[in-house]
Amino acid sequence: MTSSTFSAPIENRYFEDYKAGSVHEFGELTVTQDEIIAFAKEFDPQLFHTDPEAAKETIYGGLIASGWHTSGMMMRLYSDHYLSKNASLGSPGVDALRWLKPVRAGDRLSIRVTISETRRSTSKPDRGLVHSFIEVLNQDRQVVMSMKAVNFLLCRQNL
């Protein structure tokens, strides 16, 4: 699988720039123990996310990031590198969210986005829908999380 490039920079990207079948790889974000613990204490206070010593005695054998934290890190990379800065209109939701492998302190995460389908809206012709399959990869290229997403984007042709 080879990575594609967009025909337009993120600041000038519209629906027409998202091509079905293209694959895009972005980012690198390093996970830290402090971030894992801080997120978990606030939003997912389970011992294997908040207490490095107690986490050693769990099935994970050590501290792991909350899946919701991993999802948030994915969104940061997705927003910074993939979503249009001027034409993104949000998303009606995601499907098939899966946390496949634990994410640990020191892991370096990137994302791979495969555009599976694009179509112009029939009810609102100023926009289109982009269906994507998103994978979060660690430094060993193992998929640690995946999901399907749909995004609404403005069309360039209507400007």
Regions found by a protein language model. Give the residues of each.
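Short beta-strand or tight-loop elements
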Residues: P92-D95, I111
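Hot-dog-fold acyl-thioester-processing enzymes
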Residues: T2-G93, N158-L159
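HotDog/MaoC-like acyl-thioester-processing domains
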Residues: M1-A20, W99-L159
